[in-house]
Amino acid sequence: MARTSAIDYGRAAKYFLLLDFIKGFGLGMKYFFAPKHTVNYPHEKGPLSPRFRGEHALRRYPNGEERCIACKLCEAVCPAQAITIDAEPREDGSRRTTRYDIDMTKCIYCGFCQEACPVDAIVEGPNFEFSTETREELFYNKDRLLENGARWEAEIARNLELDAPYR
C-alpha cells in the first residue's frame, strides 16, 4: 500500500496566516467602537416595570383610613415568615392591625403578600434603593410601612392601574 501525502492547503493557510486570530481581533474591535448600552446608574435610572417588586408599603384609603383589615392572609402566605400581624376589634365591629411588622432580612420579595391581600393594603413599591447601615433598620413596623405608602402612593396607584388587566 502506497501512502500518499496530501496537503490540506486551506488548513495550512489558516494556520500560517492566523485567520482565526484576525477574525477574533476584528470582532473585538467591532464591539470596542460600537455605542455602549450601559446606564450611568446613580445619575441615570432605567425604566421599571409596573410589576416591579421593591420596598414594601401599607396603603390608606383617600379618606385617610388604613386599608388593612387584619385578615392575616399576607402573614399566612409568606413563605419566609417575614410578616407578623396583631389585630384588635374596633368599636364599629371591624378589625384593624395594632402591629404590622415585616422583617426585611427574611423577605424574599416574592410578591405573595401583595397577591393575597383582598384590599390592596400591602404592596411592593417602586423603591429599590433602601440600603441601611444596621440590620435593625430592616425591621419595618406599621408606621414605617404607612410612611412608605404615603411617599409612593401616586406611583403605586399608577402601577396597580397598569397591572389591573392582568390580575
From Swiss-Prot:
EC number: 7.1.1.-
Keyword Coiled coil (UniProt): no
UniProt entry keywords in alphabetical sequence: 4Fe-4S, Cell inner membrane, Cell membrane, Iron, Iron-sulfur, Membrane, Metal-binding, NAD, Quinone, Repeat, Translocase, Ubiquinone
Subcellular location: Cell inner membrane
Cofactor note: Binds 2 [4Fe-4S] clusters per subunit.
Disulfide bond as UniProt keyword: no
Listed PROSITE patterns: 4FE4S_FER_1 (PS00198), 4FE4S_FER_2 (PS51379)
UniProt xrefs under Gene3D superfamilies: 3.30.70.3270
Residues annotated to bind [4Fe-4S] cluster 2: C78, C107, C110, C113
Domain annotation 4Fe-4S ferredoxin-type: ranges: 58-88, 98-127
InterPro entries assigned: 4Fe4S_Fe-S-bd, 4Fe4S_Fe_S_CS, NADH_quinone_OxRdtase_chainI
Pfam families for this protein: Fer4_7
GO biological process terms held by the UniProt record: aerobic respiration
Cofactor dependency: [4Fe-4S] cluster
GO cellular component: plasma membrane
Membrane topology according to the record: Peripheral membrane protein
Substrates-to-products reaction catalysed: a quinone + NADH + 5 H(+)(in) = a quinol + NAD(+) + 4 H(+)(out)
GO MF terms held by the record: 4 iron, 4 sulfur cluster binding; iron ion binding; NADH:ubiquinone reductase (non-electrogenic) activity; quinone binding
Binding site for [4Fe-4S] cluster 1: C68, C71, C74, C117
Record-stated family: Belongs to the complex I 23 kDa subunit family.
Role summary: NDH-1 shuttles electrons from NADH, via FMN and iron-sulfur (Fe-S) centers, to quinones in the respiratory chain. The immediate electron acceptor for the enzyme in this species is believed to be ubiquinone. Couples the redox reaction to proton translocation (for every two electrons transferred, four hydrogen ions are translocated across the cytoplasmic membrane), and thus conserves the redox energy in a proton gradient.
Subunit-level organization: NDH-1 is composed of 14 different subunits. Subunits NuoA, H, J, K, L, M, N constitute the membrane sector of the complex.
Matches recorded under NCBIfam families: NuoI, PRK05888.1-4, PRK05888.1-5
Protein name: NADH-quinone oxidoreductase subunit I 1
Provenance organism: Cereibacter sphaeroides (strain ATCC 17023 / DSM 158 / JCM 6121 / CCUG 31486 / LMG 2827 / NBRC 12203 / NCIMB 8253 / ATH 2.4.1.) (Rhodobacter sphaeroides)
UniProt lineage: Bacteria, Pseudomonadati, Pseudomonadota, Alphaproteobacteria, Rhodobacterales
Gene: nuoI1
